[in-house]
Amino acid sequence: MSAIPLNRILPLGFLLIFSFISLSSCMEFVEDPNNQGGLNLQQRLGNQWAVGHLMGKKSLQDTDFEEMESFAKRNVENMKAESERELRHAQLVVRNILEQYLKNMQN
């Protein structure tokens, strides 16, 4: 009599158990046609997949970005000027920090 190792039986057993669990959860509920309960709600509302993140959104085609005042026209010169301003500001901050550090070191 040959013994089957337990490590070969367990994966097959788990596969069978989980396949039966998934089948039982996928079965549809049979309901009374006169009952307008919550089980039939999905069929009345239609497909609700990926609707929540679209609520309250407008189409981008409806928005004219060029006419909106809140969007400044961005070109290379404007972006370069902004980056130079940010760089100067960062250099000023670092310079102030170093000056404070040197003052504290001398005291």
Swiss-Prot record:
Purpose: Stimulates smooth muscle contraction. Role in induction of hypothermia, stimulation of DNA replication and release of many gastrointestinal hormones. Possesses insulin-releasing activity.
Species assigned in the record: Bombina variegata (Yellow-bellied toad)
Protein name: Bombesin
Keyword Isomerase found: no
Modified residues (Methionine amide): M55
Taxonomic placement: Eukaryota, Metazoa, Chordata, Craniata, Vertebrata
Domain of life: Eukaryota
Entry's family note: Belongs to the bombesin/neuromedin-B/ranatensin family.
One MF term in the entry's GO annotations: hormone activity
